[in-house]
Every structure is written in C-alpha cells, then in structure tokens.
From Swiss-Prot:
GO terms for biological process: chromosome condensation. Belongs to the histone H1/H5 family. Residues 1-38 are annotated as: Disordered. Erythroid cells. The lineage of its organism: Eukaryota, Metazoa, Chordata, Craniata, Vertebrata. Keywords: Chromosome, DNA condensation, DNA-binding, Nucleus. Histone H5 performs the same function as H1, being necessary for the condensation of nucleosome chains into higher order structures, and replaces histone H1 in certain cells. This is Histone H5. Residues 1-15 have a biased composition (Pro residues). One of its GO terms (cellular component) is chromosome.
Length: 38
C-alpha cells in the first residue's frame, strides 16, 4: 500500500515542471531550486 502513494505524488509534480520550462526559459534557475526542495 506504500508503493501506490509515492508513485502518484512524483507523477503530477514532474508534469508541471517541464511545462513551465518550455513556456518560460527564465524558469531554469528556479527549476533547480524546486528539485533541491523536492
């Protein structure tokens, strides 16, 4: 039961990240911060 919980969490987080980077190149610096926070 622990497996299905962590799986859906990283999935939605990975989707909004690439979308923001594609739209705004300035999101690269904050992008690294988001990874470190995660």
């Amino acid at each position: 039961t622990e497996s299905p919980i962590p799986v859906p969490a990283p999935a939605p987080a990975a989707k909004p990240k690439p979308k923001r980077v594609s739209k705004r190149p300035a999101s690269h610096p904050p992008y690294s911060d988001m990874i470190a926070a995660a």
